[in-house]
Amino acid sequence: MSIRKLKPTSAGRRFQTVSTFEEITRSEPEKSLTEGITSSCGRNCYGRITSRRRGGGNKRLYRIIDFKRDKFGVPAKVFSIEYDPNRSARIALLHYADGEKRYILAPVGIKVGDMITAGDAADIKPGNALQLKKIPVGTLLHNIELNPGRGGQMCRAAGTYAQLVAKEGKYALLRLPSGEVRNVLSTCLATIGQVGNVMHENISIGKAGRNRWLGKRPEVRGVAMNPVDHPLGGGEGKSSGGRHPVTPWGKPTKGYKTRNKKKPSSKLIVKRRGQK
């Protein structure tokens, strides 16, 4: 994938960059692997906003992705590389030898016609899925399970990967994109390689309207609100808020740790992100 800079025919297009989509081989999704998706606009079942700054955006069809990779020993052929509006990564359509079709995240280096499989007997090549205990130390991984059989939960965004650092007993030590180093059960599945669409992080949105297409609404500063709406609101004229920066619910922001210290998975974290 490469990035194309648009001609500055207007102020909104001056700094805008877009993907060239040269890796896409098919424009229409597999109908049997799509379903409707309804936007809640950040509201819960009572109609109250629980996730701010959401709403609008283009309609989408949800592509059903195989994060579990539980079709062991059955070879599959990469039929197409497709765009997915629900995620930053590209997706690959697999045609299995028994006739089944599934979508997976498309890793770097995968192309139409490649053969992919899952299981302990699979080769160490991009797109194949194995248990962590069967993967050599130093390998780059994505779509990693936290619990065996639950499906991949880590490293699914475009360009991300984790590195297998060591294997000790029933655990495998992984270095995650955030810099965190943590233990994961060695019986968990992971997919070989780095997630594709690596240049996604370098795309410049360029204008506010393009974020609205994605369903993202504006973020209003607390000091611009009324006192009833935010702890930093109110005051005559422009004010600084009069206190250290806080969330709308009064908790300190800018560096305040919010992780629960009693979380059971804390004992699996060897080094927290940001630590040297």
UniProtKB/Swiss-Prot annotation:
It comes from Solidesulfovibrio magneticus (strain ATCC 700980 / DSM 13731 / RS-1) (Desulfovibrio magneticus). It comes from the Bacteria. One of its GO terms (molecular function) is structural constituent of ribosome. It holds the Pfam family Ribosomal_L2_C. Signal peptide: none annotated. One of the primary rRNA binding proteins. Required for association of the 30S and 50S subunits to form the 70S ribosome, for tRNA binding and peptide bond formation. It has been suggested to have peptidyltransferase activity; this is somewhat controversial. Makes several contacts with the 16S rRNA in the 70S ribosome. Part of the 50S ribosomal subunit. Forms a bridge to the 30S subunit in the 70S ribosome. One of its GO terms (cellular component) is large ribosomal subunit. Keywords: Ribonucleoprotein, Ribosomal protein, RNA-binding, rRNA-binding. SUPFAM superfamilies: Nucleic acid-binding proteins, Translation proteins SH3-like domain. This is Large ribosomal subunit protein uL2. The gene is rplB. Residues 224-276 are annotated as: Disordered. HAMAP family: Ribosomal_uL2_B (MF_01320_B). The keyword Transport does not apply. Residues 254-276 have a biased composition (Basic residues). GO terms for biological process: cytoplasmic translation. Belongs to the universal ribosomal protein uL2 family. InterPro entries: NA-bd_OB-fold, Rib_uL2_dom2, Ribosomal_uL2, Ribosomal_uL2_bac/org-type, Ribosomal_uL2_C, Ribosomal_uL2_CS, Ribosomal_uL2_dom3, Ribosomal_uL2_RNA-bd_dom.
